[in-house]
Amino acid sequence: MVSKGKTAVVIGAQWGDEGKGKIVDVLSENFRVVARYAGGHNAGHTVLIGGKKFVLQLIPCGVLRPGCRGVIGNGVVLDPIAFLNEVQRLRDLGVAVDGNLFVSSRAHVILPYHRMVELASENAPGRVKIGTTSRGIGPSYEDKMGRRGLRVADLLDSTLLKKHIENACKEKNTIVHALFNAEPIDPDKMYNEYAKAAEKVAPFVTDTAVLLNNAINSGESVMFEGAQGTMLDIDHGTYPFVTSSSATSGGAVIGTGVPPTSISTVIGVTKAYCTRVGEGPFPSELHDAMGDAIRKKGNEFGAVTGRPRRTGWLDLPLLRYSNMINGTEWLVVTKLDVLDELDEIPVATSYKIDGKESEEIPAQGCGFDKIEPIYTKLPGWKTDTTKISKYEDLPAKTKEYLKFVEQQSGAKVGILSTGPDRDQSIYTDAFVNALGLKHLGK
């Protein structure tokens, strides 16, 4: 009997932007398939290879590695135009996309009226601003859950596509005009554009659930690439300031069609501090010069939107919560170098809520308003870590910081990232041995 291939789910342990793209890239040489399972082209992953900058929004990072296939699973919402533009950008950079990239026939499609509805809704008077990327992600998921969405398989059926667009435009145009006084969308123009796009998308489309299960059952290794972060998860995040899909490890099963028993390990990616884009609770947020300094040194601006990220200290109650929800076995700590010059590093270890110490994560967004973080101050290492390549060569105080994070969070540190390049990655021996890594992302 052939043993099943190893699998790993890589998730964001915070509010997204943790550096998952780089980590998936450096690990992907050890995997034959990398699969996206949630989100859309609102998830910006930046990867630097040989001086070239690759910004991936929808396509899995694995396609940047020769011999590694990329899969866009059924849990993703696909904007066909954005997808084709990203494919062309990769071709222009010399990436072999054709024959190495596959799109689920069951993935739902983002259409122009989804963006129109989102923009109108986000800017409506009296509406709570979520801080979306205005790319139609949420409304597409709404149509999916309302059983009125268009799937990729339907996109390829010209008769069904035309009928769907005609009916949907009648509904959406009526809604946005009545509620937001927005201009209507021309269904004929939309059909012509998307019928042409469908012809170019068609060669990538397949039943990716079959592809992934066959790969695992034949002994191939598969990595599942999460989007956003746990605290943006539709169920477990800081609702309503969340994304519209499952950003946790459980989403990998639902969003690709593989069974839960096929998941070997979960890798959680966290920055050495915290960031957040858009609105919503952020207990350890910094509103002073230190927050500005971290933003500047960490280049904390969105890969997709360019928006400045809010910054704050590492929040261990949130990290413990993320590890619990995801079953995280290994941690990847990124942006460690951003803290290199600090004399001391505060870390939130618990909260004070209504005068009482607590580690509970409030279910209500307003509950976070009552939180006062309790900090433990750790000594800084005052050493440049960007050129260190071995764990044993790290400063003693850096190791103390990492050991503290391990003890407090309940997960083991597997990788440290000290810069944007592939070779600015430090692996622990325990992680390398546990995953059987042969290539260390150079």
UniProtKB/Swiss-Prot annotation:
Its cofactor is Mg(2+). GTP binds at residues 16-22, 44-46, 309, 335-337, 417-419. The active site is at D17 (proton acceptor), H45 (proton donor). Keywords: Cytoplasm, GTP-binding, Ligase, Magnesium, Metal-binding, Nucleotide-binding, Purine biosynthesis. SUPFAM superfamilies: P-loop containing nucleoside triphosphate hydrolases. Gene3D superfamilies: Adenylosuccinate Synthetase, subunit A, domain 1, Adenylosuccinate Synthetase, subunit A, domain 2, Adenylosuccinate Synthetase, subunit A, domain 3. Pathway: Purine metabolism; AMP biosynthesis via de novo pathway; AMP from IMP: step 1/2. One of its GO terms (molecular function) is magnesium ion binding. CDD domains: AdSS (cd03108). Homodimer. This is Adenylosuccinate synthetase.
